[in-house]
Structure formats: structure tokens, C-alpha cells
Amino acid sequence: MDFAVIVQHGVVYGLVLSVLFTLVLLGAVFVNTEIMMNDYPPEVKKVYGAEKDPKTRGQRRVFSLLFLAVLFGVITWSVVSAARASSTPLTFLPIFVLIFIEVFTFNLWDLLLIDWLIFNTIQPKFIFLPGTEGMPAYKDYVFHFRGFLTGIVFSLVSALVLSGIALIVVNAAG
């Protein structure tokens, strides 16, 4: 398959993944800000303290399952779409590139739009954990950049694993 088509599919489905993940993330924060507390800067978590809402763990599980459903759904959709668009059977490398681009696209989207634009710059009131409003850590761009670097490693590892699974599924359906 032409790698230009793989890259195009990766970017398009990466943007779909990003929009859907953003909706799930915003939904989680609207339901209960504590759901996303693990992703907050350490200074904010220290001032806030332990989770205060007993429902948080259960809600976090629900939203984690939604994240996984979106991830697997979009990746499955993209691999099937790429396989249908290809005149030759997909091999590991194109599937890996496709999935890596999708996950990396979300990682970049998360850094630029969710973390730096919304969390660090716009700072809507609903993102603040009660009692931590105005803390300088809410403007810590470096904290989120480090998370982005970790996300690159996650993108590589998850793309390797998911590509192997996708290749098995594509060949079995073949």
C-alpha cells in the first residue's frame, strides 16, 4: 500500500480519535474534576489532597472504559478502512505506521489544544480542583511537555502492540 495513503489515513483517523477523546475527557471533567486528578501537576494534587468524592473511583473506571472503547473502535475502523483501500494485503509496517500516526496525532493534540491552550492558557473554571484555583502549577507548560514526551514512548509501544493484534485480525478475516 502507498505510504502516502497510510499517512493520510493516520492523520484523518488520528483527528477523529482526538476529537472523540476530547469529548470523553471534557465529559469526565464536567461530571467530576477528580476523575482526571492523576493528570494534574503534582503541586496541585498535593494542595488538593486525597480524593474527596467517594464516587470518583467508579466514575474513573467508566471513563477509562470509554477511552478504551474509543481507542479500539477508531483503530479498528481505520485498519479496516485502510485494508479495504489497499490493493495488496496490509503487512505489519503499514499497520504500525498507521496506528502510530493516529496515537501520536492525539498525543500532539493533547499537548497543544487540551494542555497548553485549554489547561494552561484559557483555564475555564471547570478544570480547577476546588481550593487550588490560581495556583502557578496550572500554567506549568513544562509539566505537560514532559507528559508529551512520555506520550511519544506510549505511542510507539501501543502502536507495536496494537499493530500485532490488528495484523492477526486482518489475516484471520482475510
What function would you assign to each model-found segment?
Residues 48-70:
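Interfacial helix-start motif at the membrane-water boundary
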Residues 162-174:
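Juxtamembrane boundary at the C-terminal end of a transmembrane helix
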Residues 113-133:
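Juxtamembrane non-transmembrane "cap" segments at the membrane-aqueous interface
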Residues 1-8:
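Short, strongly hydrophobic alpha-helical membrane anchors
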Residues 12-34, 102-119:
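Hydrophobic alpha-helical membrane-embedded segments
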Residues 87-105:
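Interfacial segments of alpha-helical transmembrane regions
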Residues 127-145:
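Short, membrane-exposed interhelical loops at transmembrane-helix boundaries
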Residues 63, 140-158:
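Hydrophobic alpha-helical transmembrane segments
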